[in-house]
Amino acid sequence: MDKYTALIHDENFSTLTLNVSRYPKSLAYWEKLLNYIVKASAPICKSTEPQLLKLIRCTYSSMLNEFPYLENYYIDFALLEYKLGNVSMSHKIFQRGLQAFNQRSLLLWTSYLKFCNNVISHQKQLFKKYETAEEYVGLHFFSGEFWDLYLEQISSRCTSSKKYWNVLRKILEIPLHSFSKFYALWLQRIDDIMDLKQLSQLTSKDELLKKLKIDINYSGRKGPYLQDAKKKLKKITKEMYMVVQYQVLEIYSIFESKIYINYYTSPETLVSSDEIETWIKYLDYTITLQTDSLTHLNFQRALLPLAHYDLVWIKYSKWLINSKNDLLGAKNVLLMGLKFSLKKTEIIKLLYSVICKLNEYVLLRNLLEKIESSYSDNVENVDDFEIFWDYLQFKTFCQNSLYSSRYSDSQSNGLLNKELFDKVWKRLSCKEKKSGQEILLNNLVQFYSKDTVEFVEKNIFQKIIEFGWEYYLQNGMFWNCYCRLIYFDTSRSYLDKRQYIVRKIWPQIDKKFAQSVLPSLTEFCESYFPEEMDTLEEMFTEEP
């Protein structure tokens, strides 16, 4: 029996695949399945059965679809393809991983560049990769390994040392964890200079003359002049060293030393509140530096361990909106946050507003439909009231957008069509089983127009009274909302409103609920009908 046949008939394999199909969001089950397949297929080489290789590839790919932030698995997958001789496929896997991180994964870049060092012989093509990596991860606090690789390739592939000097000089200005190593390289390079002309490789002639008073065309005794020039260079280097050292110590002591998780964590893993707080402070600090590339990078770093927490997604999108006016970028961040975060309420709310500002009503509709379908088309049963109310508001907005017909059902009964109104009624019928019922009633009073007061009164307030739902009838806010519905009806005169509330609404209140209802009604009366305070008091204090 071949390995593939033996594997698919293996009882353990069946159990592992069943666990993955039942719990696709469990990283532990995916890892167990992948490890089992790889172990059963060992040694994996070009002669391994094609069916086994296909199974391994499918498992890797499916796992990375579910968990796109697994840096190490992109690397393992890519290097496996390299081992099998599929260089182009390795490139694609690395690039797929980098795309998942918006090109901002230091681990993926260093692994990819090591791979590129071995397979790309064309110098320009290779250095283009390094330049792209520099753009995205060059400012990373722990990017020392990347810069080491870059300098190493420049040394081995470039005949001129000017590029080396340029890159090294750039590194000196970055607060890196391993900054002292690069300063040592710089000072060693200065010591190795044997001719004044070589100083032009450090910087331009004009800058040397203007800032350091060093003339590389000096015609006097060049030996002593060169030594003096080196002293000036070392002096300014040490001054720069002190500045960068202070920055590094500050960043490390306040932030980096308190961050222990620098990798993706599954939804089951809890990150300590102290570490989360450190990340938030670190991001605030980064934003104040006003270096966009570093801000993007540190947000991406924070999302690695905190992908399932909504606060980083929200903070990132708000920075894009408020500081960069980048609504499109904020939308993409929030859509990713919706996929990862366990708490979605605030993300959805912010995403709704961003989509509306972008006038992407089709996307808004699709999002609302997905949210509704995720609750089996019973969004009114969601425990979180904010999700329900936001859904209601934006569904209404979407129906009344330019894409809706002016004769559509959304206009027939005011602002909510029959479908949405039914959802409101179902939510209210849950009474104390659902949160936010008072807020819902209060919002409905404000939500409807003057033309629909009668409809709301008949189908909400009178219906609840008719059904005798004590949860509402003993709640002063219910009666307060009912009174305000009538009071804010602009089609009635002040006298009509007053008489209707005093003669029609108040008498419907059971006096056994007087103690719980009276405070809220008193508040209403003091605000709108102070002259009826005595009437209210008499109505609820007289003996039955």
UniProtKB/Swiss-Prot annotation:
Keywords: mRNA processing, mRNA splicing, Nucleus, Repeat, Ribonucleoprotein, RNA-binding, Spliceosome
Protein name per the record: U1 small nuclear ribonucleoprotein component PRP42
GO CC annotations, alphabetized: commitment complex; nucleus; spliceosomal complex; U1 snRNP; U2-type prespliceosome
Domain of life (superkingdom): Eukaryota
Name of the gene: PRP42
Pfam families: HAT_PRP39_C, HAT_PRP39_N
Protein's job: Essential component of the U1 snRNP particle, which recognizes and binds the 5'-splice site of pre-mRNA. Together with other non-snRNP factors, U1 snRNP forms the spliceosomal commitment complex, that targets pre-mRNA to the splicing pathway. U1 snRNP is cotranscriptionally recruited to intron-containing genes. Required for U1 snRNP biogenesis.
Compartments it resides in: Nucleus
PANTHER family: PRE-MRNA PROCESSING PROTEIN PRP39-RELATED (PTHR17204), U1 SMALL NUCLEAR RIBONUCLEOPROTEIN COMPONENT PRP42 (PTHR17204:SF23)
SMART domains: HAT
Assembly description: Component of the 18S U1 snRNP particle, a subcomplex of the spliceosome.
Sequence motif: Nuclear localization signal, positions: 230-235
Note: Present with 1730 molecules/cell in log phase SD medium.
GO molecular function: RNA binding
GO biological process terms, semicolon-separated: mRNA 5'-splice site recognition; mRNA splicing, via spliceosome
HAT repeats: 7-39, 51-83, 85-118, 121-156, 163-195, 255-288, 290-322, 366-397, 456-488
The keyword Transferase belongs to this UniProt entry's keyword annotation: no
